[in-house]
C-alpha cells in the first residue's frame, strides 16, 4: 500500500500521544476523536493519502480536503487522525504500520487506539479496559484502566496491536462498554435476530435513529485526558449521553416486544 503523509511539521516532543479511532459499529472512537479535535481547538498539520483507494475528497466550508487529516494540540500534546471515511479493512494493517513508522520518526511517546465492546457483565459500566504489551500493564492499571483478563483480539483492533507491539512507541488498545452494542447483543441473545445481515440492518437503523454511542465516546475522551494528563471539558457530551442511553433502551424495548404490539409503537427519535 502506498501511503503518503503530507505534514507541515510536528515538534519532536516525547510527551506527544497519538490517538486514533478503530472503526467499529458504535462509532464511539470516531466521536471521541471528533470531540477532542473541536474541544482542544486542535490545529490541522497534515493529511494522509492512500494511493490504492478510489479518490475520496472531503469538503469543509468549500475547501477540498483529503479524507484522513492529522490534527495536533501543542498544549495538550495530542496528535490525532480525523477520518472522514473509514479506512478500508484490506489496507488497515499497512495504514497502521506506516502511521506508526511516522510516529516513531517523530518521537511520539504513546499510540492508543479507541474502540468499544458490549458490556462484559449484565449492564455496561464506566470502566475503560485496555490491552497492551506485558511491560506496560501495571502503568495502565495506575491510570485507572481495567485489563481485559482473557480474550482473542482479531479484526482491526488485532491489526493495531500486532503493529504496535515491540516498537519504541508505547501502544495500547482502549475499549469502553457501549450501550448500543450491549443492546444489540441483548437482541441477538433473545433469538429474535438470526442472521448477521439482520443484525447489521438493525444496527444501521438504530444508528440512524439515535446516532453514534456518545456515552462510550465520553468514557474514551476521559481516558485520553488521563493519559495525556490534561483537562477536557466534557459537559456537552455528558448532557447528550444521558439522553442517548434513554433512546437506545426505548428503541430496543420496542424491538423486543411481540410483533403485534411493536407495530403500534413509534420508535423514539430526537
Spell out what each predicted region is.
Residues 1-79, 85-94, 98, 104-106, ...:
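Accessory terminal and edge-of-domain segments that mediate assembly/interaction
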